[in-house]
Amino acid sequence: MGRKPNNMTLYEFKGTWRQIGQQYGEACRDGIRAMTSFWKDRVFAPAIPHVSLDELMETATQFVEPIKTCAPEYMEELEGIAEGAGIPLNEVLMQNGAFELNVAAPVYFGGCTSFAATGKATKDGKTVAGQNFDWCDGAEFAAMKIVPNDGPAILGVAIVGQLVMFGLNDRGVSHFANELVYPKSVVGVPSLVVGQKALSQPSIPKALRCIAQTPCAIALNHLIAGKDGDMIDIEVTPDKNGYILPDREIITHANHFQTPFLQPHDMADQIFFVDTYLRDYRMRQLMEDYYGELEAQLTMEFLRDKRGCPTGICGMYDPELPLIERGGTIFSICTVPEEGKAWIAPNPVEYEYREFTL
């Protein structure tokens, strides 16, 4: 049985950050409004049914001051999204702080697996990087090209209503991210804001500095890779950060800590993330098996890998699981930053990838 055609639309937004947000909100209005109910009914209600939508939105206001302090331009974008979609700002804050709010809800919808390779590991020496993003079924997402007046253009993919942190920019920087589970969270900058801020940097060193110096609310893994062959992985927590350098010009990551001093604090196996160890091992195994031959089309096949199904690199929905655990890969992205290209697909086992260019 063949894969389904990929008819994804690439949305393009330009101007000031407020204008970009307004265009985003207008273009994706129906989806953004639908996602408010999605987050409440599909994500939070199964785990914390006693918490109302109004309470979630009120809690999300805690992100306003951290965002204004560290990334005021994205506060403008979020306000623009609310204006364009015709919804209260608190709804947009709730959607963009959903991963932070989710810390209090013990739900598992599958784990993300990311990778990067360059130099001798790749067929042509160019950097290739990407990931699968796993979440619960029903989440809407979109491919976007963002061209701000005052920074690099971005090409990426995001859940509708959220900022873009999965993709690349026109300076040759790619950024990807994986959830981590750590015993502490604080009132800080939401991970989506940190991710888009990193993706908006003109170089790997500046992206690294941005991630390291922004006070995050929860633990998150950031993988950044550049057209010149620089790449690094940063495991961020509210307390301290761990840094992982390439091994044989390859980095792979899933949803557990790899930095030795952070591993004792890892809680991945306590909230259904046990498969993270197998996914990371499998991705590393595939990349080592094809060392020196790695390129975009081949790594896209890795992202289709179903070993360990339904919780392999490409997660598949299992209707027999409880709703609170039922998830899978909702989108997949592969980038070659030197070429300014991204290949994006819904679940790649079921759909073809579609190529987009900055």
Where in the sequence are the language-model features?
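C-terminus-biased signal that marks the final domain/tail of proteins
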Residues: 1-111, 199-241, 246-358
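Flexible glycine/proline-enriched surface loops and loop-helix/loop-strand junctions
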Residues: 60, 187-194, 268
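Internal mixed beta-strand/loop scaffold within catalytic domains of large alpha/beta enzymes
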Residues: 97-192, 209, 330-333, 342-344, ...
